[in-house]
Amino acid sequence: MKFKYGTVVLGSFLGLSVVLAACGARGKFDQFDDGKIKLASSLTSKAAANALQTIIEKYNIVKSGKDYPIEITQIAGGYDGGRTDLQTRVSVKDKTNFYNLILNYPDLVSVLARSGMELLFDKVNVDKLEPNFLKFNEQISGVAKSGNYGIPVSLSTDILVLNGPVLHYILNSAKKEEANSQVKSQIKTSQIQAKGSLTIDTDENTKSLWEKIQNSAKANGETNQKGRKAAKSNKTALVQLKNGADTTTNEENKDTKTSDDKVKQTWGDYVEKDDGLKNYTFRASVFENWHDFLDFSTRVAKSFTEKVSNITNKKGTDIQGVLGVDSSPNVLFASVFAAGGGNYENFFYKLKDGRADFSNFKNKGSSYQNLQSVFKD
């Protein structure tokens, strides 16, 4: 009977990677060689599962004749289900039905390492991978020696989405009228609200962002005679504010008042306050770091007391806040990692003598200090 190596884990701190299993020592075992590579997947998204299936089918077509075909083994329960299934099969030394690859997070390598089932990718060419994407391997504890035990397959991405029309109403309500500016030449004088004292910086990034914010409000205000959105292919209310293309057309026929008036119905009136947007200078860089972003969001909330900061008797359809977060853990992890300079040694744990060291959580530890800094923000 032929045997083949055990398990590969696909998963990383940012996404998915690959881990192999070895044989010969205490706890290790070989699998029966069934002439195929089993890839365990616990993906819960149908679209992602279908995409994976398409990739595997393509690989099986183009692979060389001497290479084994890949077969997907579906595991229920998401990543946690995959972890439980792997732990069970390793503990009972399942030689027949155990898989060779698994899509999961890289800490599963440590689970395999307890039984000596981890294996280095020492013969895999990773030249086409960004080295930073492989750094998670340096944070895996309990392995026999350092190296690449996992290879990233996909990455998780956090994005920031700005509501252009709403942001325009907020800034336009708070800013002071400028005597001679490009902004004034593009907007009707009657539309410029001279209530506040906010200024918009004149650096190139801010000027570009402000122009796109204006364009999104103009597009949002365009309606047909029936009061519905104009359905022209070259017009959209959603403009890629930071990096999108310029969508300005027929500027003389566009204005922002319609959009601002509609947004005002939901957000209420602007109130000039010392701890709000009074004398505030708006810059595009406010969206590039956590501290300034939270400060700006807080100031906006305090500047719209009627609809935002007043939490008494709020309904589900009312404005719940300025900043919405889809995943609180991801925001916490990303902000703490950034506060530590993007250095794993300053993150939640670090490796010491091959083992996880959580001393960073002590009062004077870097992780504790960074968590405290983020919390105070």
Curated annotation (Swiss-Prot):
This is Uncharacterized lipoprotein MPN_281. It is a lipid-anchor. It is found in: Cell membrane. GO terms for cellular component: plasma membrane. Residues 1-22 form the signal peptide. Pfam families: Lipoprotein_X. A lipid is attached at residue 23 (N-palmitoyl cysteine). The keyword Methyltransferase does not apply. Its main location: membrane. A lipid is attached at residue 23 (S-diacylglycerol cysteine). It comes from the Bacteria. Residues 217-260 are annotated as: Disordered. Keywords: Cell membrane, Lipoprotein, Membrane, Palmitate, Signal. Residues 251-260 have a biased composition (Basic and acidic residues).
